[in-house]
Amino acid sequence: MGQCLRYQMQWEDLEEYQALTFLTRNEILCIHDTFLKLCPSGKHYKEATLTMDQVSSLPALRVNPFRDRICRVFSHDNVFSFEDVLGMASVFSEQACPSLKIEYAFRIYDFNENGFIDEEDLEEIVLRLLKSDDASEDLLMDVMHHVLSESDLDNDSMLSFSEFEHAMAKSPDFMNSFRIHFWGC
């Protein structure tokens, strides 16, 4: 791994990033420092990109069972610009609004990207949360049936965004569990 050119972030850029994200100045500067350490040699941070492997190997994501989906949802063309990284950190910050967190959670959990969280997606979510490919079929069916019976308001065996949003709004733990401190900031 190389290192980006050590350009100081311009004050105007810092103010703009702070206005456009839910991050504090210190968090932005901490993310900037980490990004500089990871990005290719000789590049200015605004032109540099990180690979999905670099981002998914960060300590906070390395242990997350959804790291590949998180990276896919937040990256552009499978690479991360500094602004992509800021956007991801902003959504997972404590200060991000519930509606934004719900929108991104839905996109992350929609594995087949069909615009719904269907049985295929629910099975993948459960398997990843259990960290097992050998969960019993009965357990998978029980969990999927429970989720759908609680959240599938139109009984079509899948969750639309509005159904998912309704379910997450009722979940007291959602806001606390949909947080990641990426940079040790």
Curated annotation (Swiss-Prot):
Q: Where does Ca(2+) bind?
A: 110, 112, 114, 121
Which protein are we looking at? Answer: Calcium and integrin-binding family member 4
Record organism: Mus musculus
Q: How does it assemble?
A: Interacts with ITGA2B (via C-terminus cytoplasmic tail region); the interaction is stabilized/increased in a calcium- and magnesium-dependent manner.
According to the entry, every stretch annotated as the EF-hand domain falls at 62-95, 97-132, 138-174
Additional comment: The binding of either calcium or magnesium may significantly increases the structural stability of the protein in comparison to apo-CIB (calcium- and magnesium-free form).
Cite the record's tissue specificity text: Expressed weakly in megakaryocytes and endothelial cells.
Q: Its encoding gene is what?
A: Cib4
InterPro entries per record: CIBP (IPR051433), EF-hand-dom_pair (IPR011992), EF_Hand_1_Ca_BS (IPR018247), EF_hand_dom (IPR002048)
Gene Ontology MF: a single term: calcium ion binding
UniProt signal peptide: none
Query: Per the record's keyword annotation, is Repressor included, yes or no?
Result: no
Q: Which UniProt keywords apply?
A: Calcium, Magnesium, Metal-binding, Repeat
